[in-house]
Amino acid sequence: MHYCVVVQANGKELDYLRGEAYRVSRDAKIDWYAEPRELGTAFCFEDANVRTRFCAICVRENVTYATEHPSK
């Protein structure tokens, strides 16, 4: 399953979020990926807890985001 967060960010802010996604995924030893979506960029993780940690980073950085239902 993949747990995704769609963020509305671009430029340096998006680069920063990519770095944070890498860091939280590396710490949890799981895979992740980012892909463009109609409403922004989706960051998808293999673990719901990592998605929650990434959402906390978005809140801290004041980035607009939405979570998606898990996909297989």
Where in this protein do the model-derived segments appear?
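Short, glycine- and small/hydrophobic-rich beta-strand elements in well-ordered beta-sheets
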Residues: 20-36
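Helix N-cap motif at beta-to-alpha junctions
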Residues: 11, 44-52
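Short glycine-/aliphatic-rich beta-strand segments at the starts of folded cytosolic domains
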Residues: 1-11
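Conserved short beta-strand edge segments in small beta-sheet-based binding/regulatory domains
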Residues: 30-34, 61-72
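Short amphipathic alpha-helices in soluble, non-transmembrane regions
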Residues: 17-24, 53-62
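Generic recognition of long tandem-repeat/solenoid scaffolds
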Residues: 5-7, 41-44
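Short glycine-enriched loop/turn motifs at secondary-structure junctions
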Residues: 1, 34-39
